[in-house]
Amino acid sequence: MDNKNISTTYNPKEFEERLYSNWQEKKYFTPVIDKSKKPYTIIMPPPNITGKLHLGHALDNTLQDMLIRFKRMQGYCTLWLPGQDHASIATEVKVENELLKEGLYKKEMGREAFLEKVWEWTDEYRERIREQLKKMGCSADFTREAFTMDENLSKAVRHVFVKLYKEGLIYQGNRITNWCPKCQTALSDAEIEYEEKEGNFWHIKYPVVGSEEFLEIATTRPETLLGDSAVAVNPSDERYAHLVGKMLKLPLTDREIPVIADDYVDVEFGTGAVKITPAHDPNDFEVGKRHNLPQIRVMDDSGVINHLGGKYKGLDRYEARKQMVADLEELGLLVKIKPHTHNVGTHDRCGTVVEPIISKQWYVKMQSLADPAIEVVRNKGTKFVPERFEKTYFNWMENIQDWCISRQLWWGHRIPVFYCKDCGEIMVELEDPTKCCKCGSENIEQDKDVLDTWFSSALWPFSTLGWPDRTDDLEFFYPTSTLVTGYDIIFFWVARMIFSGIHNMGETPFDTVLIHGIIRDAQGRKMSKSLGNGVDPLEVIDEYGADALRFMLVTGNAPGNDIRYIPERVEAARNFANKIWNASRFVMMNLDRELMDKYKDCQEYSLADQWILSRTNSLIKEVTENMEKYELGIALQKVHDFLWTEFCDYYIELVKPVLYGDDEKAKGVVFNVLYTVLNTGLKLLHPVMPFITEEIYTHLSTETESITIATWPTYDEALNNEKAEKDMTFIMEAIRSLRNLRAEMNVPPSRKAKVMAYASEEAKDAFINGGAYLEKLASASEVTFLDNKDNLDNNLVSVVVKGGELFLPLLDLVDREKELERLNKEKTKLEGEILRVEKKLSNERFVSKAPEAVVNEERAKGVKYKEMLEAVLERIEALQ
């Protein structure tokens, strides 16, 4: 501790890296299991190894770090376990694209050679992510870091797959899947981005066999007509009742298909007749099952028409569409083409339009897994913060479909299913078989597909702690405490972790799910590569420091709500850090440790001392309660307001006369108060601004070697001083009001003036005891107290405050004639501006043609000018 030897300026580059290295060296983030302490565990949502971290990661990890640092200081045995996700398809696409730059093709390389390249990528990007998290100040235990493809996590994946298979919950079946024709794999819903695009409805005639009649259908995908198995109408639709059971000639083919009746059809939508293509549409698939229709798949894995497509065989789906529409028109079967805006799903990694296609995949039966996961949330075994996101969770879980877990990729956990090529036996065991368990043949091969990335991610809370082995970490730290994540993956990840935890561990994996929103740009747009509005958190850290970025991400952040990234707010955060630095340096440069020790038990406090100590105590209670309720943004705002305004702007300024004076005892008392308040403030600020608080604390405090392991302040009801807080509230309002009054009258702070105060009974003590504070902070030459307001000089201007009324003599402050002249000029100018705005807004052409934002801006100007004019008129009246 060396309170004098601290840098004169706040420069985070000087200490952030040094401090983090010291934290790691001292193993502050690596918990040793201590059963005398309560565990508090957060398992970090694993970022994908596909590139650098973005602002969303910075927000997610800042919130987690706040909670971990808070609980660590509260004395919990805290574990924040970091890691990364192998991100199967995302990583495979990235590596493929990199290899293409070298002229290398995945399929030509072969599986093993390609996977070697992926592991090289993995090692590089895991290290990058690790370093980025450290730069953000994340107090995670990197000695326990996990990766979804680690040996033990792969072992956990194998155990769960085998368990589910033997329980009859994993099966292989033909169902509709989201298919990427470019990557040639099934996709999860999370890997699809939907965008509104202009398209068409093609209205096509389907002739009724043996009749002159036809049925008109409308479709956005005419190329799938080749796989139609029926046309459906609603059973209540009288227009088509006579056609139900009849056969239709399927255009462009030599097949006939039936007209069926099904409640799925919306009478009001389109023509009320719907082509049913069970192999190419999820809704049609369900209709087809109900009516036992054939599933005719007319596209191959690359989106090209297959051998069932007749003359269109070998054409890409869009080329086939073009040719088929032309042929339909030539045959007189194309009724019309109607423009139509609809949502089109594309693969988020390669941008290819996704094709719903029937394919043979591995699935998990979900109903029996979902039911207990619904109950645990309903019974508050796991709580969502905010609670409204329970509806999102229930909505998905109560309408859950079986989960497609196979992917036609190379990178990932290979499906542990083995086939005997001689007798067809299927083997699913914990160890790879060497021969067929049925016929003894050694001619066996493993399923070529890999598991959906979310399969391994679903096991993250317990696989990272050593499961399926009963490790000490698993016994002590599971179930975990809080999961912090975005609302966009409640379905894909949160729900799957809950049912996986219950099914494999017998209990929910976490007590609380803290949901945050996404980060948008200043205009409220989602950040994306296409918009070019993304922000690299490391660039922000390089310019402003990690603390400023963290502060900006948390202030104003309410659970579940999106936040906007506004560069000026990061600058404001850095200004706050700078103010804390300068105030702390001022305190430390003036502290006399000997006098502190000499008078540490002296409690001859001034009103300001009593007030700031009481406010500090109240702040401890409020901030602790906010943190416990996950109101992290509110907690931070309170600490900010206290340190900036109450401590820096008021208390430090009020005690400067004591610091510069000769009263040794008064100095000793103030030194102790300054130390106590600053030390406490640093601790309350530490969870969100770890670097600056550590650097100041190590120069200031003698408690512990690091604020990281310091004790969180505790509230002491005995330290409450309501009277001091109330009295200082009167004084501070008086100071603010006097400053505002002087500013309105253009009086410089250097010009002192007498203040006369008429105080109510409850405020008398405050003004008597705090008169010196008005002199110090409100430029009062002296303060006198009035018993009544009778016979007051007309040459006074007054302001009403809570607790009384304050009077200033005009002659002491302004040249009345000059000020009236200035105000009248201002009045004329404002009247002109108001006239200009009103004229503009009365112009109908301007209001109708100008952008709405411009019109609103003019209206706002008009309101502002009128308010300013009103204030000027009041001031003129006062001077006259």
UniProtKB/Swiss-Prot annotation:
It catalyses: tRNA(Val) + L-valine + ATP = L-valyl-tRNA(Val) + AMP + diphosphate. Residues 810-845 form a coiled coil. Its main location: cytoplasm. A motif ('HIGH' region) lies at residues 47-57. SUPFAM superfamilies: Anticodon-binding domain of a subclass of class I aminoacyl-tRNA synthetases, Nucleotidylyl transferase, tRNA-binding arm, ValRS/IleRS/LeuRS editing domain. Signal peptide: none annotated. It is found in: Cytoplasm. InterPro entries: aa-tRNA-synth_I_CS, aa-tRNA-synth_Ia, Anticodon_Ia_Val, M/V/L/I-tRNA-synth_anticd-bd, Rossmann-like_a/b/a_fold, tRNA-bd_arm, tRNAsynth_Ia_anticodon-bd, Val-tRNA_synth_C_sf. Keywords: Aminoacyl-tRNA synthetase, ATP-binding, Coiled coil, Cytoplasm, Ligase, Nucleotide-binding, Protein biosynthesis. ATP binds at residue 529. GO terms for cellular component: cytosol. Transmembrane segments: none annotated. A motif ('KMSKS' region) lies at residues 526-530. One of its GO terms (biological process) is valyl-tRNA aminoacylation. GO terms for molecular function: aminoacyl-tRNA deacylase activity; ATP binding; valine-tRNA ligase activity. Its EC number is 6.1.1.9. PROSITE patterns: AA_TRNA_LIGASE_I (PS00178). Catalyzes the attachment of valine to tRNA(Val). As ValRS can inadvertently accommodate and process structurally similar amino acids such as threonine, to avoid such errors, it has a 'posttransfer' editing activity that hydrolyzes mischarged Thr-tRNA(Val) in a tRNA-dependent manner. Monomer. Belongs to the class-I aminoacyl-tRNA synthetase family. ValS type 1 subfamily. ValRS has two distinct active sites: one for aminoacylation and one for editing. The misactivated threonine is translocated from the active site to the editing site. This is Valine--tRNA ligase. It comes from Clostridium perfringens (strain 13 / Type A).
